[in-house]
Amino acid sequence: MAGEKTRKILVDNRKARFEYEILETYSAGLALLGTEVKAIRAGRANLNDAFARIHHGEVLLYNMNISPLQTAGAFAHDPLRTRKLLLKRREIHKLTGRVEEKGLTLIPLKLYLEGSWVKLDLGLARGKKLYDKREDIKKRETKRDIERAMRR
């Protein structure tokens, strides 16, 4: 249909889903430089160790590594600079209240293209305990064993 935008996932933060329990997800735009967009499209972005914070009514993304392209030359960007996330004011106010709760944080989950726009799925998350992680691993292994047995 006309007007539908395709969604192409560029980077997926799989580690976040293992280490955190995701309570809510939000879709946010990113304020990027031109060289950063080119580098992201080339697959040079990394969401590991990235997190977001709310500072003076703005949501900022820290530690997202976007390696510059070699062709950027003098126009190369700082790979670890702080980037602003573009959310609606109502969403920011809602997140501000939720993040102030004990143990909740904002974690980037996916970086994707929606049409020509680079967007980020942001998750409101609570850290998992070690026994929760072990439980997830056990469930995954039993599921894998069952699938193997079914194939035989």
From Swiss-Prot:
Location(s), subcellular: Cytoplasm
Gene name linked to the record: smpB
Membrane spanning stretches: none
Family, as annotated: Belongs to the SmpB family.
Keyword Aminoacyl-tRNA synthetase: no
GO cellular component: cytosol
Keywords carried by this UniProt record: Cytoplasm, RNA-binding
CDD domains per UniProt: SmpB (cd09294)
GO-annotated biological processes: trans-translation
Broad class of where this protein is predominantly found: cytoplasm
The UniProt record lists the keyword Cell wall biogenesis/degradation: no
Protein name: SsrA-binding protein
Molecular-function annotations in GO: RNA binding
Taxonomic placement: Bacteria, Bacillati, Cyanobacteriota, Cyanophyceae, Gloeobacterales
SUPFAM superfamilies from the UniProt entry: Small protein B (SmpB)
Role description: Required for rescue of stalled ribosomes mediated by trans-translation. Binds to transfer-messenger RNA (tmRNA), required for stable association of tmRNA with ribosomes. tmRNA and SmpB together mimic tRNA shape, replacing the anticodon stem-loop with SmpB. tmRNA is encoded by the ssrA gene; the 2 termini fold to resemble tRNA(Ala) and it encodes a 'tag peptide', a short internal open reading frame. During trans-translation Ala-aminoacylated tmRNA acts like a tRNA, entering the A-site of stalled ribosomes, displacing the stalled mRNA.
